[in-house]
Amino acid sequence: RPNIEEAKEQYGDKRYVGLYHDPLIGLKTNVGFEFEDGQDISIFDGCDFVCCGDIHLYQVMNYHGTPIVQPSSMVQQDFGESVDNHGYVVWNVQTKEHQHVNLESDYGFYTFKINSIEDIEEEMEKLV
């Protein structure tokens, strides 16, 4: 962990942004798995806000008023993720507020249920 306190003494009123790419305890995946192992969010003590990567699901955590944001991925990466709710985050550095921008996509991973070849011939296949 960088010495944020020392940097604040030296540089004063700057914004201190945490950047992190790995699982954090408490983050969830698209299938509902919650990380119990990983890094504790207390490592961001002293940051003004935190931008994360790794988990492809938009979610926000909070550490003593510090927003910790997982923006999601830009598009669905595999069958374990939903087709929608992918995008990016725009930060207002002064207010420490963010906005999640959802991106629509014409592509995705889908699962179809087909009981017989007739389902395809008669266009009766079902999106699961």
What function would you assign to each model-found segment?
Residues 1-128:
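Extended recognition/assembly regions associated with phosphoester-bond processing machinery
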